[in-house]
Every structure is written in C-alpha cells, then in structure tokens.
C-alpha cells in the first residue's frame, strides 16, 4: 500500500425541471432479472430509515435554515460505491444505509437497487423522472473489469476518462455534466477539486411533475410567511379549493396534507404544532411515515394557501456520514474492489439540490408548511410557517426529496 493515498470523490447531483427522461443503461447490456433481491417493502423501509437519519443530521447542522436533499440520490451513490468496498468498509456502508446484514446479502442489495433504477427510469407521459450514475476516471487509472461491468449492469453508470492533474478543467467537465443532466439547476456541484483526485462518482436525479389539480396564477397574491416569532416575510401565495388526502395527528402534534401529481405520485406537507418542530423531527421513522400514509383520508379543503418559491442547497456530507457510522471511506478505506489495491480514499462527498414550486407543479421538489384553521363546515389550510415536506414515488415508495422549509423567500 502506498504511504500517500489518492483522492476519490463521491458527488450527488440532483434536480427537477426537464423535458425528457434519460436512460443510462448501455444499449448492448441485456439485464435478466433472475437474481434474488430485497423485496420492495424492505428496500423502501431501509431507504426511508436512512432518509430520516440523514435529514436529522442536516437539520441539526443547519438550524433555522431551509434543508432540502434527495436521500435517494445519496443512498444510490453510496450503494454504488459499495461495489468496490471490502471488509469492514463494505459493512459500514451497507449498515449505514440501514440494511440488516444478518438478513440480507450484499448481492441482493445491489440487485434491488438495479431493479429500482430500472423502475424509476421507465418512460411516462405523466412524469419526467430520470436517475443516473457516472464515473470520472483519471486517464491512467486501471479499474477492475468486474467493477466496470457491475457499475454498468447494476447501476447503469457511464464512464468518462478525465485528466484530474488539470483540476480546473476536470472540475468544469464534471460540473458541466451535472448541469446538463439537471437542466441547469445544479450549476456548480464542485467548487474545488484536488489534482490528486483519481476517481469521481456522480449520481443525479431529474424530476418534474404537474399537480393533478393545478393552482390558478390569477389567484396568486403576496402574503405573510412567519419564519419565526419575530420574523415575517412576504411571499407569493397560491390558493386552491380541492378535495385531497388529509390527516390530523394528535399523537405527534402535527397536520398533514397530501397533494398528488398527474402521475399519482405525491408531495406530503407536514406542519408541526407551534413549538413542536424538534419533537416531530426526532420521531421521524419509517413506521411513522407508514402510519401517516395509512391514515390520510380525502377531505374537502375550501382554501389551501401554498407559497410559490425556488430554493437551492449544497452540502458536504463527510462529517454527517461519519455521524451515521460511515467513517472508514474517509481515512482507512478498503476500496480494493475498484482497482485491486487499497490506496483509494474518499476525500469529499458533495450533495446539491434545487427545488421549485409554482402553480403548475414541482420542479425538483416542493416545500411548504401547513397552518390550519377549521370550522364546522370549512377547512382552511394556510401554508404560512415552517414545515416539512416529503415527495414520495407511489410505485416504489421511494422518498426522492425530503426537507424543511423555514423561509421560502431565501433562494
């Protein structure tokens, strides 16, 4: 093993706003779905558990700020990385992703992600969604044939030879790739690249959906959004009268409203009672989400007020992943399944998200909070203070975006 280890970066780019789906599986690769895989419920539960764990750490690190991420993008990228991990490094990654390795084999996990990627990239007239992976490889770096094959077949990954010694040119190449795949929403995923970088893995998600019941722009007006007890901002507030799934959770002290897209996927808006945000965040679990979804019932909302906004985020996840138990990849990694030698170490995990909400629907993700007023005959929902949002794909029960909107006026 060399005394000085070379850099390996994991990037997570995501977005919304697009015109077409992108299919990354090479045309010459025929996949036969004959392998055992984790059942859909188990994969969704593990991904949801990881999603909430990741969100909680980001919320702690970014108090009183907007928090927007795609936990699915992070899960896919780490699972992709685990293809080349060995020993305790592999165990840390998979257990960090909330898989019980006494019940599930590594091979089953990879085939489950393969199946998920294929399902997500199915063409649809109602939804613009594509998920893809890419490898940027130092020109003289020799990857193992097994890793290249598994990356293509299981994770639909593209590969690009890259000269990282010219770090600015390499940075531009990767940022331009992500910008193109996200229709310009993620413009600068990497702000810096070391000349010692050998390999960069990128995952992106592109998502755009239309509300099943769109808002009328003529009814959008400026209104107050209460960021905190002593801060109020003006935001464009959309309004709508509709029947939609609703649940009042007395046990956890929150109100939920679900808005569906034409694809029947949905955005779940969650408003904790005054002073209950931290308590609610602490109780976010897969079981909580399942209970909420089973409890939602159609109700007539006579006046729904929802802010129109566009926000972005960019996170370095090294410390947060370490808090979740994924540590060895940053210091004492065994990633010998990539090159055959254990001299690669992950130097940076970067995650970027861009989210837009308007009268037509969601680009990237939607974020809104819910404040509710109720009379005997009328339900009025005012999205006018901090709230949580989860965008869930119906067929796979995958949370593609998760966040907290504290101030919708901040880009």
UniProtKB/Swiss-Prot annotation:
Stable at temperatures up to 70 degrees Celsius. Incubation at temperatures above 70 degrees Celsius rapidly decreases inhibitory activity. The record marks 377-378 as: Reactive bond. Residues 1-24 form the signal peptide. Detected in all tissues examined (at protein level). Abundantly expressed in liver, kidney and spleen. Lowest levels were observed in diaphragm muscle. Keywords: Cytoplasmic vesicle, Glycoprotein, Protease inhibitor, Secreted, Serine protease inhibitor, Signal. Potent inhibitor of the serine proteases elastase and trypsin. Moderately inhibits the serine proteases plasmin and chymotrypsin, and the thiol protease proenkephalin-processing enzyme. Does not inhibit the serine proteases cathepsin G, furin, kallikrein, thrombin, tissue plasminogen activator and urokinase, or the cysteine proteases cathepsin B, cathepsin L and papain. N-glycosylated. Homodimer. Glycans are attached at residues 100, 180, 230, 264. The keyword Secreted applies. This is Serpin A3-1. One of its GO terms (cellular component) is cytoplasmic vesicle. It comes from Bos taurus (Bovine). PANTHER family: ALPHA-1-ANTICHYMOTRYPSIN (PTHR11461:SF145), SERINE PROTEASE INHIBITOR, SERPIN (PTHR11461).
């Amino acid at each position: 093993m060399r005394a000085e280890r070379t850099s390996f970066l994991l990037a997570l780019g995501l977005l919304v706003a697009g015109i077409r789906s992108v299919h990354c599986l090479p045309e010459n690769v025929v996949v036969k779905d004959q392998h055992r895989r984790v059942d859909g419920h188990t994969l969704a539960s593990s991904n949801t558990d990881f999603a909430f764990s990741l969100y909680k750490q980001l919320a702690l690190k970014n108090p009183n700020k907007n928090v927007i991420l795609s936990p699915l993008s992070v899960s896919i990228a780490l699972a992709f990385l685990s293809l080349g991990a060995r020993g305790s490094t592999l165990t840390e990654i998979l257990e960090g992703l909330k898989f019980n390795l006494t019940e599930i084999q590594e091979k089953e996990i990879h085939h489950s992600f393969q199946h998920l990627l294929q399902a997500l990239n199915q063409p649809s007239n109602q939804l613009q969604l594509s998920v893809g992976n890419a490898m940027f490889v130092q020109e003289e770096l020799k990857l193992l044939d097994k890793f290249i094959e598994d990356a293509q077949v299981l994770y639909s990954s593209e590969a690009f030879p890259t000269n990282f010694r010219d770090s600015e040119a390499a940075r531009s190449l990767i940022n331009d790739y992500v910008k193109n795949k996200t229709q310009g929403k993620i413009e600068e995923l990497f702000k810096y690249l070391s000349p010692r970088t050998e390999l960069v893995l990128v995952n992106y998600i592109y998502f755009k959906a239309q509300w099943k019941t769109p808002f009328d722009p003529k009814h959008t007006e400026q209104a107050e959004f209460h960021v905190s007890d002593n801060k109020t901002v003006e935001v464009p507030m959309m309004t709508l009268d509709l029947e939609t799934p609703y649940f009042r959770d007395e046990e956890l002290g929150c109100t939920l409203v679900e808005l569906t897209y034409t694809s029947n996927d949905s955005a779940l808006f969650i408003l904790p009672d005054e002073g209950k945000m931290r308590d609610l965040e602490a109780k976010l679990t897969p079981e909580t989400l399942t209970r909420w979804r089973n409890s939602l019932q159609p109700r007539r909302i006579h006046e729904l007020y929802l802010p129109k906004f566009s926000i972005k985020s960019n996170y370095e996840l090294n410390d947060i992943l370490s808090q979740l138990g994924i540590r060895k990849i940053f210091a004492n990694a065994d990633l010998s399944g990539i090159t055959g030698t254990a001299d690669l170490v992950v130097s940076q995990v970067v995650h970027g998200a861009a989210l837009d909400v308007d009268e037509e629907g969601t680009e990237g993700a939607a974020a809104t909070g819910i404040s509710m007023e109720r009379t005997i005959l009328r339900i009025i929902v005012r999205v006018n203070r901090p709230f949580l949002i989860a965008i869930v794909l119906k067929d796979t029960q995958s949370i593609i975006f998760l966040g907290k909107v504290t101030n919708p006026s901040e880009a």
